[in-house]
């Protein structure tokens, strides 16, 4: 069956509201860890994760940083308008560049209270320290709105403006306002690159102590960047997967990491992705390696049979050659890769991840990695009191077939 024909109703489960974690635990690494491999299920705490990883593994994390993408304005009438900055128009060449803009920028946004705001109207927000921010409604674009933002002092970057005027955008299933503590806890300790509107939540559990334990166990780690968009929360609303449009996200990967991945796989050692965003980035590298000149990954690129038996090491070698020819040290592009049941994993042998919403593309990704056992894993987690979603517990899932064959 082609993934486009998959019925979404087959990938659901009942998630009681009291199982959704609305606050993080006091200690990051005290979260529970479900371990699945070879059909067996076990559990531990995140602080002991090194004991469950193969020696010589390479863990790959997403070092994106959540920006304070929600801004609240008040109209002169007192009406509240909230702007949720999603992504810049294509003319800016990506999120990272748009965040460096000074004085003014345009952004695609979701609007809370949109019916109270008319095209052309300007909202004004004055902040302590002299920051004055104005927002003008330009036009509606599908489900989003194009908003022109300008500010004084004009020398401030948009990233600085968001930091001073905005607040952290918590997921829609966390039914509370963002608190001061969320600025720290809804952020990984290794977050470096501004650009996400949602955290790569699998990494929220990791602490300096865990990184020390990984090094002591001869388990290496490195980083990619994928800026997480609000599309990560969108449920699949179509009856089949073919009716769903996967969101496009920006990725940034260094030549050094691609070399490390190639050598790790060539030596027969496993690559473990920390988070679904890292997994999608890593798998996208394979398709970039065997793809065309435009160096982007589209939604269904993995399902056309174009791999023709090309191994992951060969694909990465081709990608490195292409980067050498182009004289680039970093690969900055976009991916729309949809990973669902029927996908043949190329690079990732294991995944550290949280528990995901029913009928989501993230749950489909889990099903593609461990097959129908995703039901056993989720049933176990529900029956044994695991906490779900962004601030919840997580799991370490191994794709044994991938670990045995990828080199």
List the predicted regions and their residue ranges.
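Surface-exposed, charge/polar-rich loops and edge strands
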Residues: 1-407
